[in-house]
Amino acid sequence: MQRLPIEQYSALLAEKQQKLTELLAPFNSPPLDVFASETSHFRMRAEFRIWHEQDDFYHIMFDQKTKQRFRIDQFPIASQLINQMMLALLPLLKQHNILTHRLFQIDYLSTLSNKIIVSLLYHKTLNEEWLQAATQLKQQLIKQGFDVQIIGRANKQKICLQQDFVDEILPVKNQQYIYRQVENSFTQPNATVNCKMLEWAIDCTKNSQGDLLELYCGNGNFSIALAQNFRKVLATEIAKPSVSAAQFNIAANKIDNLHIIRMSAEDFTQAMNGVRAFNRLKGINLQDYQCNTIFVDPPRAGLDMATVKLVQNYERILYISCNPYTLCENLQELTKTHRIEKAALFDQFPYTEHMESGVWLIKKSN
């Protein structure tokens, strides 16, 4: 079992705080709001390769520096539920040769609502015999008290024993939000820190006037929680499974002022600028929206220059970043027109150098 340096957690977080403070200093950022993580069992998903050794097999990971493999029986950064499943699953898999033969990876996705998806990945075609054994495995796990979905994956094959999603329930500001999370789609890995991010975003946008535009909305994680602060919300997302999950989440949370369209941020920028018309915007009149606030949560590469220019047209910008270096590149442009009103560090990834951050920008008065 790996041991976490829990006694060093506060010092490691303070280092990140200092680093991010230094990075944001050229942009006249106010002091950071800092949101700590749980010190163990904070990660809601995990992926392991499977190593076969004679009649035995076990979870492994690879050391990023040495590339050496090491055995994992327990994984203290992963949720308690994932650790319980890791212990329960392997002995049951060993009872079914068809389930272990050419199995090379196991992915786990768990929720605070105590549900879990187990994805078994194979270098072989999955057949009826596999399905029967997997069904038996699922029943054995249910008998042990797990609320579990089993998925088999192989080349150009995906077999769901029931469904490929779990419904998460997140407590945010004395409310509970339901979020459908689809296997193999992006979800925030640290659920408790995600709740803190949502609460910070709600606080930033409190008493907002007008409407909100969100680019890269995923399963609606932010837009659903923020809808309460706006007259209307328009959100874009490119991944089909995420859009479907977002539509479910809108209905499940009884949100009636949020509309999601499936298109890239780049295409949406062209539509907003009137460069060309898009079929996907049929039935949506962009003129109906008075979006004076924009929310962006871009990939690690940050915003491309065309999107930066689009974003600068808005009175208020809420920017969540998973890469402080590309955030700072974008801020070199954004702070020409906007000032940083609030900034935050969210420790999504304890014991690593990764920093999740947020800035709330307000347009400078001329």
From Swiss-Prot:
EC number: 2.1.1.-, 2.1.1.35
Enzyme class: transferase
GO MF term list: rRNA binding; tRNA (uracil(54)-C5)-methyltransferase activity, S-adenosyl methionine-dependent; tRNA binding
Xref: SUPFAM superfamilies: S-adenosyl-L-methionine-dependent methyltransferases
Stored InterPro entries: MeTrfase_TrmA_AS, MeTrfase_TrmA_CS, SAM-dependent_MTases_sf, TrmA_MeTrfase, U5_MeTrfase_fam
Keyword Transferase found: yes
Active site (record annotation): 322, 356
GO annotations of cellular component type: cytosol
Gene3D superfamilies with a match to the protein in the record: 2.40.50.1070, Vaccinia Virus protein VP39
Reactions accelerated catalytically: uridine(54) in tRNA + S-adenosyl-L-methionine = 5-methyluridine(54) in tRNA + S-adenosyl-L-homocysteine + H(+); uridine(341) in tmRNA + S-adenosyl-L-methionine = 5-methyluridine(341) in tmRNA + S-adenosyl-L-homocysteine + H(+)
Alphabetical list of PROSITE patterns matching this protein: SAM_MT_RNA_M5U, TRMA_1, TRMA_2
Keyword field: Methyltransferase, S-adenosyl-L-methionine, Transferase, tRNA processing
Protein name from the UniProt record: tRNA/tmRNA (uracil-C(5))-methyltransferase
Species, as recorded: Histophilus somni (strain 129Pt) (Haemophilus somnus)
Source taxonomy: Bacteria, Pseudomonadati, Pseudomonadota, Gammaproteobacteria, Pasteurellales
Gene: trmA
